[in-house]
Amino acid sequence: MKAFPPERIVCLKEETVETLYLLGEQDRIVGVSGYAVRPKQVRKEKPRVSAFTSADIPKILALSPDLVLAFSDLQAEIASSLIQAGVTVMTYNQRDIAGIMAMIQHLGATVGQEQHALKLVN
């Protein structure tokens, strides 16, 4: 990862967008999935760089992300392309409540908001 905690994050799945906003870390987000709708202002504030299983790789690279957050094997090709381009990619596979809670805690720790993330999941 270029910076820790990461300063420039691209979110390819809407759950990570919403979580970063809930953690008060929305200023770290530099690009989002076209499906991101929560919170409402995200569509006005952040550039859209991907659909669910496709992404504009050159647009993502132009944003100079420290970290890209992806989802599961469904975005494996996108993740692979970004990794080959030298980008750090973190992939989550939250498919149930426990997985969602774990993702929130892990993402909170990644951006230095462990305590806030713990409050969200409790």
How should these model regions be labeled?
Residues M1-N122:
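N-terminal ligand-binding lobe of clamshell/alpha-beta domains
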